[in-house]
Amino acid sequence: STAGKEASGTGNMKFMINGAPTIGTLDGANVEIVEESGNENNFIFGLTAEEVHDLNVNGGYNPWEVMKNTEGLEKVMNSLIDGTFSSDIGMFQELYNSLIYGIDGNRPDEYYILKDFEGYREAHKRVDEAYRDKYGWAKKAWLNIANSGKFSSDRTILEYASEIWNINKIEIK
């Protein structure tokens, strides 16, 4: 998700608990995952929440220019409207338009998908390189597992009970 847009999710926590390094933006639970297991054991890319905020406040983002100036991105975008994915070439026209021109009064590419494209592609190259080092990959996996305790349901329930619900733990004998 775009940095600053996602409150949190649990899917990536489940992946972490099972040893998968995270590939994603520094947003939502990814922030906590990186804090626990380290940036070196995950693959973070894209704009920061501060950069997104600055673009939202100051403007200056032109998805058309990003598409034209990012190697391969125009080909990816054109594949949405040239019949690559469906003989109904209009099937993805609204998606294309939302990213390049904006629709329904919204600005174009409001989630900065095109802006993050190059970082996403580079992150995948880093994943591919890291995966070739089996020992290094196993170390990343183990460090993700070993540092995933923060996401335990027991810890979460205790924290919610005391900080949100204002109830005490009941000892069962």
Where are these regions (language model features)?
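Catalytic binding pocket for nucleotide-activated donors in carbohydrate/polymer assembly enzymes
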Residues: 1-141, 145-150, 155, 159-173
